């Protein structure tokens, strides 16, 4: 009974299948944790959604920014990006069912020994706050008001957490922290623009969210995706799993029990 955590799949379904074969994943005994961005620029987003959904309780999924964007496109709120290969989802007979399933997924998933989210956990949150914030947005996404939330979630402000944030300001910050965050300024403000590796950042105030000196201590390690430029990052406190399969990099997965890392190079599409 092993736990496998995989980085951003982004529709790279064939690579996922090879990776699961490589580690001899058994859906009857093992659990696959997916760190968000199931869909987008890879060639088989539809197949990816179908497969992960078919795993039932053997899959634990968190939402990424591309998954939320897919919902916005499905509602006509946003246009499909030119490089996204998600059109087959909308044309499929089970497209609505898959989108409904996706909308039920959380922003934060928790194991007794670790937590999984797409981009990270705000450095100003402890784990209890992160749980509560995730649940606030999750309940809205699962409600009849989800269109209102998706329609209004696109905004980089506010960029600093305050406990008294309310309404859209609160929801926007929560969504940005869980699904879009990479760098923060020294005072904890989120930077929504820089996507570079930390070694290439010249702005002295910018630092990865997980290295902020005043970051609140968490009870468990955080496993996340989203940041391909990190090219994989492993420390005692955080594990970054996005290694840019969709950018001709690789799909990376870790087995929690022995920390063995599995990697599948991107196939030529």
From Swiss-Prot:
<dbReference type="GO" id="GO:0008803">
    <property type="term" value="F:bis(5'-nucleosyl)-tetraphosphatase (symmetrical) activity"/>
</dbReference>
<comment type="similarity">
    <text>Belongs to the Ap4A hydrolase family.</text>
</comment>
<protein>
    <recommendedName>
        <fullName>Bis(5'-nucleosyl)-tetraphosphatase, symmetrical</fullName>
        <ecNumber>3.6.1.41</ecNumber>
    </recommendedName>
</protein>
<dbReference type="InterPro" id="IPR004843">
    <property type="entry name" value="Calcineurin-like_PHP_ApaH"/>
</dbReference>
<dbReference type="InterPro" id="IPR029052">
    <property type="entry name" value="Metallo-depent_PP-like"/>
</dbReference>
<dbReference type="Pfam" id="PF00149">
    <property type="entry name" value="Metallophos"/>
</dbReference>
<comment type="function">
    <text>Hydrolyzes diadenosine 5',5'''-P1,P4-tetraphosphate to yield ADP.</text>
</comment>
<keyword id="KW-0378">Hydrolase</keyword>
<dbReference type="InterPro" id="IPR004617">
    <property type="entry name" value="ApaH"/>
</dbReference>
């Amino acid at each position: 009974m092993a736990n496998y955590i995989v980085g951003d799949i982004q529709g790279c379904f064939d690579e996922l299948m090879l990776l699961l074969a490589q580690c001899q994943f058994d859906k009857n005994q093992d659990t696959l944790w997916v760190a968000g961005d199931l869909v987008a620029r890879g060639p088989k987003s539809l197949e990816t959604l179908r497969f992960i959904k078919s795993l039932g309780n053997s899959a634990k999924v968190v939402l990424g920014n591309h998954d939320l964007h897919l919902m916005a496109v499905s509602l006509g709120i946003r246009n499909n990006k030119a490089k996204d290969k998600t059109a087959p989802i909308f044309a499929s007979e089970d497209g609505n069912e898959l989108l409904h399933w996706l909308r039920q997924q959380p922003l934060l998933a928790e194991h007794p020994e670790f937590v999984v989210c797409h981009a990270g956990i705000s450095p100003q949150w402890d784990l209890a706050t992160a749980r509560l914030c995730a649940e606030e947005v999750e309940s809205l996404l699962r409600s009849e008001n989800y269109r209102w939330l998706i329609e209004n979630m696109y905004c980089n402000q506010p960029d600093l957490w305050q406990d008294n944030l309310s309404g859209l300001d609160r929801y926007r910050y929560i969504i940005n922290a869980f699904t879009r965050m990479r760098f923060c300024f020294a005072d904890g403000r989120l930077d929504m623009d820089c996507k570079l590796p930390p070694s290439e950042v010249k702005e002295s105030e910018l630092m990865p969210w997980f290295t902020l000196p005043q970051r609140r201590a968490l009870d468990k390690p955080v496993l996340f995706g989203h940041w391909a430029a990190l090219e994989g990052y492993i420390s005692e406190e955080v594990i970054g799993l996005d290694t840019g399969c969709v950018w001709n990099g690789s799909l990376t997965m870790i087995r929690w029990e022995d920390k063995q890392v599995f990697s599948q190079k991107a196939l030529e599409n």
